[in-house]
Amino acid sequence: MGFGLTGLNPQADTPEPKWDGGDPMTKVAGTEHQYEVDPQIKEEYDDFMKSRMEWQEANEGAYFRNNVWFWRPLWNFVTGCCDNILTERDVEQGYFNDGHKICKTKAKRIASRLRKYLKNGHISAYEAWYSKEISQLKEGDWNKNYPFSIQNVREFERFCEHSGGFEIW
């Protein structure tokens, strides 16, 4: 399970690729709930998906991905340092990938706060503290699987800055 955040109005250098070929999925014969990309359009759809992923990578505010292991520590940190930016509902809904929206103003303020903390060394200190805490957990403790990294914070800051607000999926 992962979290895919989509920019609501990302600042982009090029237009986002759009699929106009209708529903690409078709039911697999002999199954009740299994679907696949229609074999007749698979190559075309794969090309579209590749171009869309390239566009997302080239435009920082378009899409941000984290698996659940990386997302939770990041969101914990963000909610702690942005407690006067995010509402209680934002904080709670950020732990679920069900489409909660963070508006452009909040996204910009989150980015600004993260930049400040990146610059003043607060995030480096937090990463060191977090790593020490994780290393002291007992073997087999699932919390050892939740890493925190400055690079992840940096990428999230850039996403927030350029997203125009975002949805958490």
Where are these regions (language model features)?
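Acidic (Asp/Glu-rich) sequence patches and key acidic residues
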Residues: 1-169
